[in-house]
Amino acid sequence: RYPGAFEPMDAAYDDQGRPQAYLIYALLVCATKDGRWLQFAQVSPKLIGAWLTELDLLGELADPKWQGFPMLPTPELRTEWWDMMIERVGARTLAEWQHAMTENLDLSGELFRTPEDSLNHPQTAHEGRATTVIDPDLGPVRQPSTLIHADGKPLTQLRPAPRVGEHNDSVAFDQVGGAALPAPQGDHHDPPLKGVAVLEFGSMFAGPYGATLLADLGARVIKVEPLEGDNIRNLVAFPEAGGAKVLQGKESVAIDFTKPAGLDLVYELAKRSDIVLQCFRGKAAERAKIDEASLRAVNPDLAFVTTSGYGVDGPFAHRAAYAPSVGAASGLARVDSHDTGQPPTDLDDLHRRAVKLHAGGAVPAVQSDGIAAHGVGSALLVALYAKRRGKMLTNVVTTMLGTVQQAMIAYNASYASRPAETPADEQFFGMNALYRMYRAADGYVFLAAPLPREWPALAKAMSPYADLHADERFADADSRTAHDEELIAALTPVFAAKTKLEWENELCAQDVGCVEVVEANSELVLQSDPYYEAGYAVDAHSPIFDEHRRLAPLCRFSRSRTRADAGCTIGQHTDAVLSEIGLDEAAIADLRVREIVGGG
């Protein structure tokens, strides 16, 4: 509907390392007085106000110079404000900042940890989300516990990985525990979750997108929003664009449930729901009387999943969590930034390191919000499945931090004989000569032939351009490892001689893994015409954006279809949903006048 009205920013910093995106200030990366790196998390209006107050910068906004903050017009002004914040943070030690975050509940920040050290996080220790498994070959293995916790402990006791065929004699493959499931009624086209009603309380992305995944599978998801709407709707400069993805397929009901009449409406919705997703910090849901106990009092058959950044209790439960802060706490940012977390030597060095650490926690395709949301979707399905099998789970909890630690298990699991990780090179081209990017004539290709059995095909394919077979430095896997830099040097001019698609076509035809590198956001690529025609993207109709493309649902089924709807406006479905629970037009109008409901 609005072509050209909004162009997403490619990077948070410009080519000179100066801030471009206003969220840099809310999500400040900075070093303390004693050289420890912190990732702050102050995105909502309330939190950014608390942040500027803590830094004693709120009064500065009275100066006309800063008009329009945080969207300052020039790189010079943006950098000047950035440096003011850096100076204020750098005036305190890590211990002083940790004390401030304990005293000020609207202040949140995380130390940039390694993946292994992430399992020492105070909240991880409090919840028991790190455990030790005794492996018969490796000995004690320290690793994350289960993705889902129930009743304050891991959903199941972790066991060592089984040996091949270890349980062949002990498993009766024709027996299934629990209640028998109904047999499929032939071919049909209903979505797999048709008839499931999800009631969602949450904001932003990491929790709510878990319910979006269920909407794609056919669940009816009713999102209860405050009258002013979820903050994510206005997170980017173009109104509603920030929430377009997370609101897909949902019905929005705007209710002020801080008022008794609004809370009564919530209880009526709970009576008609199968499962609730609650995404509030700490004990906020309990204070609002929409916690598990309160809602099960009106519907005992209600499945319930609680998710937040850090859990329902413990030292960090009250803190806000956003993708960058959880990326710092989990070790994700350190792995993807190559920064060792060393103290900065001067302001220029601080700028450079801050940009790298930010980039490590903000890779669009793999960042903490998306990882956590898939954990939430999994927990919702587990809770629904358990309910269907006649076992109602209670106090089902996932956390952003715990879920991202699960995704980092290849990096955070530790045991005595664990080999050292092979890091990517400094420029992030790849891991070694046979698993990395190379510059082609018109861009880059990625070569993926790291296994010894793949070498003969690669050497043969390259024989018109370089005689790799005859070079003793590359005779076997050990030699190639010892002469990795020389192998890179041998292949670099070869790849530079042809275009990326020429290399992809030529090498793939000879069973050598090689693809062109597309230098664009993966979601934009997957919505381009070739991928749209292949089914990776579909058309949806939004009340805000009209017809547009969106990514297709993640799953496809042999007998069931999925849904791929667009988002909704604030309270778009308020009237329709309230009518379903028995309210007439006059009653709804009265609630709107009293500012108990909105939208419609």
Question: What name fits each language-model region?
Answer:
Residues 103-109, 219-222, 272, 300-302, ...:
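Alpha-to-beta junction loops
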Residues 95-97, 133-134, 159, 163-392, ...:
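N-terminal helix-loop segment corresponding to the beta1-alpha1 unit
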Residues 26-105, 434-510, 514:
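Aromatic-enriched alpha-helical interface/lid elements that frame and gate functional surfaces
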Residues 12-16, 31-33, 84, 113-200, ...:
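Terminal low-complexity tails and localization/encapsulation signals of metabolic enzymes
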Residues 109, 252-254, 304, 395-397, ...:
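Conserved beta-strand scaffold positions in the cores of enzyme catalytic domains, especially
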Residues 1-43, 49-53, 149, 217, ...:
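Active-site-adjacent "lid/gating" segments in soluble enzymes
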Residues 21, 46-87, 91-155, 460, ...:
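Ordered, small/hydrophobic-rich secondary-structure cores
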